[in-house]
């Protein structure tokens, strides 16, 4: 990122399920020169006026996912354009599912995503997956957790045989697909 760093936080009023916004607070305190703008569900995304250095979106409830898809659906072309231009995205938890094809419930009902990435998620609200990670990384103790109702896969069948993430996104045959790679779009769960 060159020049002034501008971070746009999408929908902080609903995309903060696990306190994800503290990531942004940490950045603001570590780098006071960073400008942080927030886009709320009731407003137009700031990225329509000025392209940010980074777009951040935190974990959502299932209804929050629906509201986010509804809101961002009219901006899909701009999102794809920004991905292709190398704008960085940091998306936490289940928010990535918003950018995928669909979220399928065990009862067969489906919520559509933005269809930017060729992912498919299966949701089972009666069986939450929880895990705790205790380990070390570069000499530091790490504690992490994972708590989710969904499991995502690439493509409908969850089978991918390419050589890289760039192959996956670059070869996704869709009229408005975004040939992008993991260098600009990051997630963690």
Q: PLM features: what roles do these ranges have?
A:
Residues 8, 37-39, 90, 115, ...:
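Hydrophobic/aromatic beta-strand patches that form the interior of the parallel beta-sheet core
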Residues 62-141:
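Cysteine-nucleophile active-site neighborhood
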Residues 43-47, 122-124, 153:
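A short acidic, often aromatic-flanked loop/helix-cap motif at beta-alpha or helix-coil junctions
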Residues 12, 39-41, 58-60, 92-95, ...:
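Fold-independent oxyanion-binding glycine-rich loops
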Residues 11-21, 51-53, 93, 97, ...:
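A broad, low-specificity signal for short, low-complexity segments enriched in glycine/proline
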Residues 1-81:
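N-terminal beta1-alpha1 cap of cysteine-dependent amidohydrolase-like domains
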Residues 2, 31-33, 84, 109-111, ...:
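Short, well-ordered coil/turn elements that cap or connect secondary structure elements
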Residues 2-3, 124-189:
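Amide-donor transfer/coupling interface in amidating biosynthetic enzymes
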